[in-house]
């Protein structure tokens, strides 16, 4: 039987994973399925790094997934998932070791609430830009309420009631939300893409000859790069 690598070897291996954000491959991002993976490392801080993860890691104003690991008939909860080079699942219990095979059950209610909130944020951002030329400069999403930071050309013209009415119109229209993989030329020439200067900076940061960006389209109202769930 081949022995499992040492802790140091696991740390090096986990760092080299440069893990793919598997959640990007699932759209819609609601009702995420459970998945099975191997524990690559349990860090000194109590974080679990898996061979692969379909969890959404905190980023872009959207909180990370939470959930439960299932192993040998017992459950071990994990807190909000984060990511740097690898995706980390903070353990809220004990009982996992390198090499364990686990089933990861993502909290669906939390994910679904955040996905809906993220889509609503896209609508609010688009309406504010369409009506008053506002640019979204920040946000923080949560399951019950969220914050949007809007920079206006003329703040005095802003009408909160009008924003609410317009945003609710699009929500009630139940328009489709589509995901595309586009290159620079298609992104920069499409009239539906707003704030192209900012978008071009994202493309440059991704790098490569023709980087493909994940574009989220709320039909009829918004089209922008986004790695969140919808």
What positions do the PLM features span?
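Active-/binding-site microenvironments in catalytic and ligand-binding cores
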Residues: 2-230
């Amino acid at each position: 039987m081949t022995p499992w690598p040492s802790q140091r070897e696991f740390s090096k291996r986990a760092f080299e994973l440069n893990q793919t954000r598997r959640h990007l491959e699932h759209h819609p991002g609601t009702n995420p399925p459970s998945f099975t993976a191997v524990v690559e490392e349990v860090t000194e801080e109590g974080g679990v790094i898996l061979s692969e993860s379909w969890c959404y890691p905190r980023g872009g104003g959207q909180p990370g997934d939470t959930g439960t690991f299932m192993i040998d008939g017992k459950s071990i909860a994990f807190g909000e998932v984060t990511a740097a080079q690898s995706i980390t699942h903070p353990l809220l219990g004990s009982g996992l070791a390198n090499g364990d095979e686990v089933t990861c059950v993502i909290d669906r209610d939390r994910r679904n609430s955040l996905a809906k909130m993220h889509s609503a944020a896209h609508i609010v951002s688009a309406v504010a830009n369409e009506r008053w030329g506002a640019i979204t400069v920040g946000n923080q999403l949560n399951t019950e309420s969220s914050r949007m930071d809007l920079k206006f050309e003329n703040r005095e013209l802003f009408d909160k009631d009008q924003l609410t009415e317009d945003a609710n119109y699009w929500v009630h229209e139940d328009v489709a939300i589509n995901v595309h993989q586009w290159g620079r030329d298609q992104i920069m020439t499409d009239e539906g893409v707003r704030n192209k200067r900012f978008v071009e900076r994202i493309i440059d940061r991704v790098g490569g000859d023709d980087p493909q960006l994940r574009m989220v389209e709320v039909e009829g109202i918004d089209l922008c790069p986004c790695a969140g769930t919808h």
